Amino acid sequence: MIASIKGTVLHKDINFAIIDNNGLGYRVFLRPDLLASLKDGVTVQFFTHEYLRENERELYGFESIGELKLFWKLMTVSGVGPKMALHLLGLGYEKLRKAIDTENLAIISSISGVGKKTAQKIILELRGKLKSDIA
């Protein structure tokens, strides 16, 4: 498993960046706000989660271990896959934690692809469990 990557931003696309690491280009999916802040040619480092599918491997990048741990917790919720978890992280750790702890369906379901039922599952399964992993 690839636990982290350090390299140069080679290219940015809609939901991923290609990071050049010693001549190999890795496609790394990132939060939309983080992706928007990257500049081509800049050296970056991310903690990563390698997601294996039938025919494909995907890398998801995070600025901190805390953010990665929150990603893992989100992925334990039935119906939440890696792309949805990444978009939820775009809310920011504190805003997401507060929305879950205060049962704020409106904020959680404001994320594209997150319906009311999924938001309710996220709240039910994660309420009170996010305080120790501050990003």
PLM feature spans:
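Structure-specific DNA junction-binding interface
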Residues: 1-76
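Short, acidic/hydrophobic/Gly-rich beta-strand patch recurrent on exposed beta strands
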Residues: 17-22, 88-89, 100
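Amphipathic, charged-and-aliphatic alpha-helical interface segments
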Residues: 57-62, 82-99, 121-132
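Short alpha-helical "recognition helix" segments of helix-turn-helix
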Residues: 108
